[in-house]
Amino acid sequence: MSAVIEARHLSKRAGRAKLLDGVGLTVAAGEMVAIIGPNGAGKSTLLRLLSGDLRPSQGEVWLKQRDIGSYTPRELAARRAMLSQHINVTFPFTVEEIVLMGAGDRSAREAGRLVDAALDEVGLAHFRERQLPTLSGGEQQRAHFARVLVQLACGEAEHGPGLLLLDEPTSSLDLRHQIDLVEAARRRAGTGTAVIAILHDLNLAIRFADRLVVLSGGKLAADGPRTEVVTRETIRDIFEIDAVVHQADGVPYVLPQSMRAAASAARI
């Protein structure tokens, strides 16, 4: 599959601080990549650079074989959609109005169809007339995810496989809706979208991503299939915890030693 997004030697400084240092990354159409790493590793900085919202101090980003800086805001919105970690919820729009913002200049009929489908997918169809600030944090997150799905669908209808960026999309969600959201992202990868998600739940990242990209101290520490990246040594070196890596149906999962000891004690 052809590359949808390619980052070359990306570095970003803020004053004297180096937030990102020489990171390279390529993600193909139909591939889902999870970015993992400790707090302050540069994950959100990398995602903002890949989105075009932030310009690198060094290096370049190519989106669909074109320098991302050469796109107009309208052109960029048609080729990549991003769910940010921090979302302004003070504006008094309804859920339906928020999701409709992703449809751009689509006809009322087409926009309505896309909005209905997205609200059904995130489980908010019954809240469509509710004011966004009256919802819980998790419900607001799902409403904005529905908007992003509509934006992505509109762009891909015109320009082919696009880029879906998710910055800690599950941070406000309960376990069920965490899984629902990541499964929805996984479905988009199945239809050709390139998906890049920052996920703090390591086992969720392992379960759904094709590749894991590990950042540490602003540098690329590892990039590869989950079976190669998820080792006891990597977990210890990057996250500074002692953990055991198990396998279930060929998929690794991580259990910190403290949890393992607690589980063993509970069985005694």
From Swiss-Prot:
**Which molecular function terms from Gene Ontology are attached?**
ATP binding; ATP hydrolysis activity
Q: Which CDD domains match?
A: ABC_Iron-Siderophores_B12_Hemin (cd03214)
Q: What is its EC number?
A: 7.6.2.-
The entry marks the following residues as binding ATP, namely: 37-44
Going by the UniProt record, its keywords in alphabetical order are:
ATP-binding, Cell inner membrane, Cell membrane, Membrane, Nucleotide-binding, Translocase, Transport
Q: Where in the cell is it found?
A: Cell inner membrane
Where, if anywhere, are coiled coils annotated? none
Which stretches make up the ABC transporter domain?
Answer: 5-242
**A Gene Ontology CC term for this entry?**
plasma membrane
The answer to whether UniProt assigns keyword Cytoplasm to this entry is no
The record describes its membrane topology as:
Peripheral membrane protein
Q: Which Pfam families match?
A: ABC_tran
Q: How does it assemble?
A: The complex is composed of two ATP-binding proteins (HmuV), two transmembrane proteins (HmuU) and a solute-binding protein (HmuT).
Q: Which NCBIfam families match?
A: PRK13548.1
Query: What's its job?
Result: Part of the ABC transporter complex HmuTUV involved in hemin import. Responsible for energy coupling to the transport system.
**Family designation:** Belongs to the ABC transporter superfamily. Heme (hemin) importer (TC 3.A.1.14.5) family.
Protein name as annotated? Hemin import ATP-binding protein HmuV
Organism per entry: Bradyrhizobium diazoefficiens (strain JCM 10833 / BCRC 13528 / IAM 13628 / NBRC 14792 / USDA 110)
Q: Which gene encodes it?
A: hmuV
